[in-house]
Swiss-Prot record:
Name of this protein: Small ribosomal subunit protein uS8c
Claim: RNA-binding is one of the keywords in the record: yes
This protein's UniProt keywords: Chloroplast, Plastid, Ribonucleoprotein, Ribosomal protein, RNA-binding, rRNA-binding
Similarity comment: family membership: Belongs to the universal ribosomal protein uS8 family.
Localization in the cell: Plastid, Chloroplast
GO cellular component: chloroplast; ribonucleoprotein complex; ribosome
Functional description taken from the UniProt entry: One of the primary rRNA binding proteins, it binds directly to 16S rRNA central domain where it helps coordinate assembly of the platform of the 30S subunit.
A Pfam family annotated for this UniProt entry: Ribosomal_S8
Region forming the signal peptide: none
Claim: rRNA-binding is one of the keywords in the record: yes
Cross-referenced InterPro entries: Ribosomal_uS8 (IPR000630), Ribosomal_uS8_CS (IPR047863), Ribosomal_uS8_sf (IPR035987)
Lineage: Eukaryota, Viridiplantae, Streptophyta, Embryophyta, Tracheophyta
Length: 134
């Protein structure tokens, strides 16, 4: 059985968001750094710091929460893993789905790197659909 790092970071972020934690610590790899850069650029997280313990690198994410009068915290986003090691899902640039009419984003792994659905449509490249975020 292999380790699915993308599912691990999605689960860590989702669990921290549901438990109203302010920060999440995830392992740093090239894939996780690319996904976190997209989340930061799209405004789903507030801040990212790189932390080094012994020989391992970690990313510390500061999540974005919204205060509400009725509820103390409201979760901002939902994450869903689409393509997984047992069942890969691919799409070309014309068939990439729009999440909530363009409000959400799709993160793809293409031949030109990891990017959002909007960037993939502009560059006219398809790839493996990693996750949906809305």
């Amino acid at each position: 059985m292999g380790k699915d790092t993308i599912a691990d970071i999605i689960t860590s972020i989702r669990n921290a968001d549901m438990n109203r934690k302010g920060t999440v610590r995830i392992g740093s790899t090239n894939i996780t750094e690319s996904i976190v850069k997209i989340l930061l650029r799209e405004g789903f997280i507030e801040n990212v710091r790189k932390h080094r313990e012994n020989t391992q690198d970690f990313l510390i994410l500061t999540l974005r929460h919204r205060r509400n009068k009725k509820e103390s915290y409201k979760t901002i986003f939902n994450l869903k893993r689409i393509s997984r090691p047992g069942l890969r899902i691919y799409s070309n640039s014309q068939r990439i789905t729009r999440i909530l009419g363009g409000i959400g984003i799709v993160i793809l792994s293409t031949s030109r790197g990891i990017m959002t659905d909007r960037e993939a449509r502009l560059k006219r490249v398809g790839g493996e659909i990693l996750c949906y975020i809305w």
